[in-house]
Amino acid sequence: AQIDCDKECNRRCSKASAHDRCLKYCGICCKKCHCVPPGTAGNEDVCPCYANLKNSKGGHKCP
């Protein structure tokens, strides 16, 4: 099933301070992983792909 990344990322980023940045990275991760964890933070165990993507500095890429 196709996931609605815009909708899922709007939900995920609804409480983020850097909202635009959150949406951008969530969108990248959603397209790669076809999954966005539930809630606005945490719950990464639901989406291991999302949780394990790293940025160039080795930190978590996905919000």
UniProtKB/Swiss-Prot annotation:
Keyword entries, A-Z: Allergen
Question: What Pfam families does the record tag this protein with?
Answer: GASA (PF02704)
Tissue-specificity statement: Expressed in pollen (at protein level).
Residues in a coiled coil are: none
Top-level taxon in the UniProt lineage: Eukaryota
Protein family according to the UniProt entry: Belongs to the GASA family.
Protein name in the entry: Cypmaclein
What organism is the protein native to?
Juniperus ashei
